[in-house]
Amino acid sequence: MLLNGFNHVAVLTADTERLQEFYSEVFDAVTLRDGPEVADADVRMTVIHVGPSAELNVFQIKGNTEAERQTPMFGRGRLDHLALQAESIEAFDTIRERLMARGAADDFVTDFGSILSVFFRDPDGLECEVCVANPDAQPGVSHPPGTRAARYS
């Protein structure tokens, strides 16, 4: 393959500080840039580093209400949700606890077979997921969405 991952995902927000705080407190993310990256003074661009080669480019645009619009799964347009990769099962557990403490996720962990997953919504309501390799996976075995992970029962 000629690629080794995603560089960034661009999102809209009505409250940059709230998103910075959330991603910093839950994921230990770091803000790399924060300011008017474009000539238009009504546009604020913030770059939040969420992983070794992954960033959220957050745009706060005066008067734009698109970040407040919520739609059901598969009705969200071309990008349905954002899935992040936890560094380890221990990091996954830490992130999961932090998400639950903030009310961003419930206690349900999905077992897809080779992958464990927890879904959450960020403060703007963006549907997101954290994934990690399943240490209990059986080779060649997959499970449908909605299968509760036994280790979190």
How would you describe each model-predicted region?
Residues M1-L2, G5-A14, T46-V50, R69-S153:
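Vicinal oxygen chelate
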Residues L12-L56, Q60:
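Core segments of cupin and vicinal oxygen chelate
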Residues L19, Y23, L82, L99:
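Hydrophobic pocket/interface hotspot
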Residues D34, D42, N64-Q70, D106, ...:
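A short, acidic/glycine-rich surface segment
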Residues V38, M73, F108-V109:
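Short Gly/Pro-enriched turn/cap motifs at secondary-structure boundaries
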Residues A54-L56, D80, L126:
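Glycine-centered loop/turn positions within well-structured domains
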Residues Q60-G63, A133:
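Acetyl-CoA-dependent GNAT
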